[in-house]
């Protein structure tokens, strides 16, 4: 699933292309992708809306439109939102095509069909269920070391599932959670309440640094991710543990292990990330 750095990379590529263009029409090839409003209203409402800005909240892309509307897009597991020349044939698994006033198109494709799109009044955006439940943005000022320390002290959960909880920290997923825990030398099964102040400080810095590094390298492409221009990311070349089972830990040389934690595959180093 695209995580914060990948969604931010898509946002930045589309922000460079879309503002000022109008959506002249939309072709919906898989109606279940559109969650609200009803399909005919969706098509009618979005027609001739001008694109003002491309934003992001957690893993949601937010395309602000004229007349007080916002197009919210969640890519889920394999979704893609790509700016295409009008003559480009749609890629396989393309489900929605937005026609633009410059003759180009915006294609939403999703092999696994889990991605979703909403068109809502901008002033009602915070009431959208998935968005209103989101936690703090980890690259913004509200996410401080003290905030993390306070929250971990009151949450009786294992650290890896907690980092994946979008109501706690918005945008973290399996890749960057595994990498952050490895960099901070914390086992994914540790209870959050047992982390020392020094470990919390390392984890805080690891989360911030890794997300920024991911953005600077245009995201991580393990299998499916491409940005708004159709280009793969580069950060997979720098991963230390994720998807590296059996390979040597870059820090100590022990073999990277894999196990299920909270129902999710977790990659870690048994030596650097010992259970305490």
UniProtKB/Swiss-Prot annotation:
CDD domains reported in the protein's UniProt record:
EcFpg-like_N (cd08966)
Q: Which SUPFAM superfamilies does the entry mention?
A: Glucocorticoid receptor-like (DNA-binding domain), N-terminal domain of MutM-like DNA repair proteins, S13-like H2TH domain
The protein's assembly and partners:
Monomer.
What catalytic activity is recorded? Hydrolysis of DNA containing ring-opened 7-methylguanine residues, releasing 2,6-diamino-4-hydroxy-5-(N-methyl)formamidopyrimidine; 2'-deoxyribonucleotide-(2'-deoxyribose 5'-phosphate)-2'-deoxyribonucleotide-DNA = a 3'-end 2'-deoxyribonucleotide-(2,3-dehydro-2,3-deoxyribose 5'-phosphate)-DNA + a 5'-end 5'-phospho-2'-deoxyribonucleoside-DNA + H(+)
Which residue spans match zinc fingers labelled FPG-type?
A: 240-274
Positions in coiled-coil regions: none
Recorded GO terms, molecular function? 8-oxo-7,8-dihydroguanine DNA N-glycosylase activity; class I DNA-(apurinic or apyrimidinic site) endonuclease activity; damaged DNA binding; zinc ion binding
Q: Which Pfam families match?
A: Fapy_DNA_glyco, H2TH, zf-FPG_IleRS
Q: Does the record's keyword annotation contain Methyltransferase?
A: no
Q: Which Gene3D superfamilies does this chain map to?
A: 1.10.8.50, MutM-like, N-terminal (3.20.190.10)
Ordered alphabetically, the record's keywords are: DNA damage, DNA repair, DNA-binding, Glycosidase, Hydrolase, Lyase, Metal-binding, Multifunctional enzyme, Zinc, Zinc-finger
Q: Which NCBIfam families match?
A: fpg, PRK01103.1
The job of this chain, per UniProt, is described as: Involved in base excision repair of DNA damaged by oxidation or by mutagenic agents. Acts as a DNA glycosylase that recognizes and removes damaged bases. Has a preference for oxidized purines, such as 7,8-dihydro-8-oxoguanine (8-oxoG). Has AP (apurinic/apyrimidinic) lyase activity and introduces nicks in the DNA strand. Cleaves the DNA backbone by beta-delta elimination to generate a single-strand break at the site of the removed base with both 3'- and 5'-phosphates.
**Entry binding sites for DNA:** 93, 112, 155
Q: Which family does it belong to?
A: Belongs to the FPG family.
Q: Which GO terms describe its biological process?
A: base-excision repair
Q: How is the cofactor bound?
A: Binds 1 zinc ion per subunit.
Active site residues of this protein = 2 (schiff-base intermediate with dna), 3 (proton donor), 59 (proton donor), 264 (proton donor)
PANTHER family registered for this protein in UniProt: FORMAMIDOPYRIMIDINE-DNA GLYCOSYLASE
The name under which this protein is listed is Formamidopyrimidine-DNA glycosylase
